[in-house]
Amino acid sequence: MLMTGSVGDGSEFDWEDQKTFISRDGGLTWRFVHNSSGLYATGDLGNIIVYIPYDPEEDGDFQSEFYYSLDQGRTWNEYELTNAISSVHPYKLINPTPDGSGSKFIFKGTFATTDSETNSITSLKGVEYIIDFSAAFDSRTCEEEDFEDWDLADGKCVNGAKYKYRRRKQDAQCLVKKAFKDLSLDETPCNSCGESDYECSFEFVRDANGLCIPDYNLIAFSNICDKSKDKSVLVEPLQLIKGDECKTPMKIEPVDIPCDEIPEEGSSDREIVTTENKFDFEIKFYQYFDTVADESLVMLNSIGDAYISHDGGQTIKRFDTNGEKIVEVVFNPYFNSSAYLFGSKGNIFSTHDRGHSFMIAKLPEARQLGMPLDFSAKAQDTFIYYGGKNCESILSPECHAVAYLTKDGGETFTEMLDNAIHCEFAGTLFEYPSNEEMVMCQVKKKSSETRSLVSSIDFFQGDNKIIFENIIGYLSTGGYIIVAVPHEDNELRAYVTIDGTEFAEAKFPYGQDVSKQEAFTILGSEKGSIFLHLATNLESGHDFGNLLKSNSNGTSFVTLEHAVNRNTFGYVDFEKVQGLEGIIITNIVSNREKVGENKEDEQLKTKITFNDGSDWNFLKPPKKDSEGKKFPCDSVSLDKCSLHLHGYTERKDIRDTYSSGSALGMMFGVGNVGDKLLPYEECSTFLTTDGGETWTEVKKGPHQWEYGDHGGVLVLVPENAETDSISYSTDFGKTWKDYKFCGDKVLVKDIITVPRDSALRFLLFGEAKNMGSGSFRTYTIDFRNIFERQCEFDITGKKRADFKYSPLGSRTGCLFGHQTEFLRKTDEKCFIGNIPLSEFSRNVKNCSCTRQDFECDYNFYKASDGTCKLVKGLSSANGADICKKEPDLIEYYDSSGYRKIPLSTCKGGLKLDAHLAPHPCPGKEKAFREKYSINTGAYALVFVTILLVIFFAAWFVYDRGIRRNGGFSRFEEIRLGDDGLIENNRTDRVVNIIVRLGLCISLITKSAFQRTKAGVARFSSKLRARFGNRKGPTYSSLLQGQFSDESDGLHEDANDLSSFTSQDSNFEIEQEDAYRPEQEHTSQIDQPATSNIPDALPARSAIHKPDSTAVRNEDE
């Protein structure tokens, strides 16, 4: 194995000091490979190793090279890419053979092209190489004598056995050239067992010295004292590791455990453990580190004292800052073990191990402005700090912000850019950045009222490019950067980039409710789309707007829902359900017209979508409340009686979301059942376990909630009311129990747990009024003892009944083009633990496309019948715009009115987004004609060739079968079967057969025609005889009068048909079950045209053909 690292005590880490090492004994010993970090890959089962440094210039020259070893890393050879472009920076090195047995490698990299005059980088280009070692050692294949036995762990016992493995000798001059097979180990059990063969027994845990000591919580859980009548019990602290194969067990001295110190078995309340901590000052800030290693968190009180806990708040230690108060705590959003505490005296305390240790550094000599840090997504120690320069006072004329850059976690800072108030490491955010070193900054000069957006690829040491001269602000989300730019008439425009270089204006749909683009809120992005709220009413206290969604590059938006509620600060009642695709909950203003006219206050209703905004429905209310009383919604439609929930705009803490990413399908909400949303204090608490399809009222009144053990434990606590109890459920909300956690009632301000909602400990922050000092308290409530065991995890969901794959709710059909099943716990008596359960789902099958897999395209709206129609007075998106973005294209297509939802993976089926006729891109007309024009020369040659063949065949038959036998005149005398024809050889016989066959067909056709003609004449004669005495126009007058009018009518019908076939499609579709593609092309023109011919029309006129025949005749 190859690894990148450094030699030291582990207290410091420097990316620039990383080296590469190799081990060929499973990590037991290591050898130095190279004095740099880079990419590496192996081939031929480890007998070929390739290493490429990240920096091609680390060896002092500009020429790119790679290093390889053919003796398992003992010696290395350098290979210069002599014909290559210099300074190729690698980003991928792979062995394309999946099992690593191949001898070929693919190396991909990038190189920069520079301006010869300024020596500045003009562009980045990619390059790819294939490295082939198949001819190494003169293509010799290894034989049996080239292999050796290798002892795992240097021949020591591992899990009670010694193992050997067959591999190629290190100095063998050959390649194995065989596909990888599962390891075939020679296993020999060890005679005696050692300490490495043992682990702590269930009732014990290891201390800091590695000794197994009793854990009384686990002892109570194991019930060992219940099986003993004595006051103590002897328990062995060690047990043999399961699967260990050593033969002779080690002698273990048991430990005497006093049973009177163990809690007796009783109710569930007595199994739950509560730990209380008191504080003299209120805890204002608290946040967990988002890791699975432990339950570490940082807390900060109102006077600047910081506290650290590593067990979910059970034991809390005050952080020693040597008297310095902490003014701010910032967590690194990209590296979950890192946090920074800013001191009031200019010190910064940083930790990279969840608060177990801290490093102290000095901030730049600048005034702390309280601006948030901006971090690099790829370098843990790189971030930007904002300080005030020349700031004796914030109001000083010379006071301005400066962006300071650190690359060593705050040990040293360099001044990066004056007047910068917000920067982003843009190059680390994009999937395909134009330059990974790019930094973008918003600059606000005190002498100017405007803000500009600038970028640099060298931290503004020399490169400083102005992107926009005047902006309102910008932000990044999901691989996009969106910039708000002021426009004329107090409007805004949004510009989007996905690489940091090319910016495109975001096109918002127009409508009657969108008069001006004055404000918008970016709601986030997910899987190729940006969600955005465009304000349509900015009356204070009555704000609302349209919910929009973009295409994959964020430039074209469509309207998903109208009148979505927002507040004055721009927050929107919009929330995506975590862990599930395409489920969104919003609150809409149902009386928007009257609100816009200031005639009524807002009336909010809650809506939900299960297909990413294409279709919306009101929440289905439960039939009964938590007391068993029926809701009055049985015979009322959902638009008049449904469930409504208070949303994002009313939250005290934005971290308190409806759902949890680990408790799949579960959501809590405070709301009511009725025709509109009631005030918060009049509402109750509701729960869904199937992603919002069905809901249950679980408690009267508003409650705070929290999820534990991936939803295996649910906890509720009353909101805005003093209490001494919580309610909890261990069966996914089916039943609830109350637990008293304290003696005196307190006002619980918040309840939290780890961000992954996987822990069994909950932390409550409460305030006990009228109790003097120590009135601010935390309560850690531990549910670890209420479960019998930990669930046995099986990714297949088959071996045990603890987990199984199942669909969510009743949605067994397709959603986003596939059927998905989730791995969920089935046994309520076990706990899940830190297993990332939300990551385990499977697609049962992909589905055919249906209407639900499409949404309306730009400037199209969804009509009441479900079809997408063009907004009156507007046009669809200009398809030619794509030609500007992709210069290599020669054609574009007009919109069909539909576009596929980015989340959908459907294949086949309905194709509502099918392209219409192509159009040439501007300037590409010639290439377009060449692509679609017919090659007339080739077709003419084929046509002439066919005519010549037919003419030659006809002439040959005439010459050999007709002319030589006397010409056409003789055939009037020849009967079939006559032997008078000349037949000298086989060719003559074949020709004469053809002639006889033609004569036979001619005679039959002639006879049939004569019989038909005679029959028609007899039938016509009978009709004239029957109707000849009736009054009416003569046959000749019909021909000269009315029939000429009918002919004109047929001519008009032909014109109508032409206009019909040229009409555009209205994009409407029938219901899915009734959809038949072939019916769309079924015309009604094959029905006979109505006629004004009177009853006296002679019989022959009855055979006039319908309009469609007339059209064909006229065309002929």
Swiss-Prot record:
Record region (Disordered): 1069-1116
Gene3D superfamilies the UniProt entry points to: 2.10.70.80, 3.30.60.270, YVTN repeat-like/Quinoprotein amine dehydrogenase (2.130.10.10)
Its placement in the membrane is given as: Single-pass membrane protein
UniProt main location, coarse: membrane
Compositional bias (Polar residues) spans?
1084-1093
Q: Name one GO cellular component term.
A: endoplasmic reticulum
Q: Which SMART domains match?
A: VPS10
Attached carbohydrates are found at 35, 336, 553, 846, 985
Compartments in which it is found: Membrane
Fetch the Pfam families from UniProt: Sortilin-Vps10 (PF15902), Sortilin_C (PF15901)
Q: Where is the composition biased (Basic and acidic residues)?
A: 1073-1083
| UniProt keyword terms in alphabetical order | Glycoprotein, Membrane, Repeat, Transmembrane, Transmembrane helix
What is this protein identified as?
Uncharacterized membrane glycoprotein YNR065C
Q: Which organism is it from?
A: Saccharomyces cerevisiae (strain ATCC 204508 / S288c) (Baker's yeast)
